[in-house]
Design a protein with these regions (language model features):
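Register-specific detector for alpha-helical tandem repeat solenoids, activating on a conserved position
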Residues: 2-3, 28-29, 54-55, 81-82
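Polar, enzyme-active/binding microenvironments
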Residues: 80-83, 119-121
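A recurrent domain-boundary module in secreted/ectodomain proteins
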Residues: 108-124
């Protein structure tokens, strides 16, 4: 699944809420360099089996919103190097903005007052 949508320059909104990714191990660069992508709906998208999510949203320079549900979870040993590198317009659901110090999976969570993140809660 890695690089599946890389460089899809014509995409602005992507809804893959119903993709079954429960057994996918490589998600590296999956959305990388999608320069015009602004919104992604991930819904039931699962990264629990993922070993590689590096560069997942790298160079998504127009990306503002990533919607996920409460089940989105990244395992501790997953390689998330540069997951959000240069996704400079991203804003979490509680207003957290891109910070170059957090380009790995540290902020790959729903943005709340207590826990800053780059994701927005997707309504069911």
């Amino acid at each position: 699944m890695g690089v599946m949508l890389q460089r899809c320059d014509s995409l602005k909104i992507l809804n893959i809420s119903n993709f079954d990714t429960s057994n996918v191990t490589n998600m590296g660069y999956i959305f990388g360099s999608c320069y015009n992508l602004e919104t992604i709906y991930l819904g039931s998208f699962s990264t629990k089996s993922a070993i590689y999510i590096y560069n997942m949203f790298r160079l998504c320079s127009s990306l503002k919103t990533i919607y996920v549900n409460n089940d989105f979870e990244i395992m501790e040993d997953t390689d998330s190097t540069y997951m959000f590198l240069d996704a400079k317009n991203i804003v979490g659901g509680n207003g957290t903005t891109y910070n170059n110090s957090y380009t790995n999976a540290t902020y790959a969570r729903i943005d709340t007052e207590e826990t800053p993140g780059y994701f927005t809660q997707q309504q069911e």
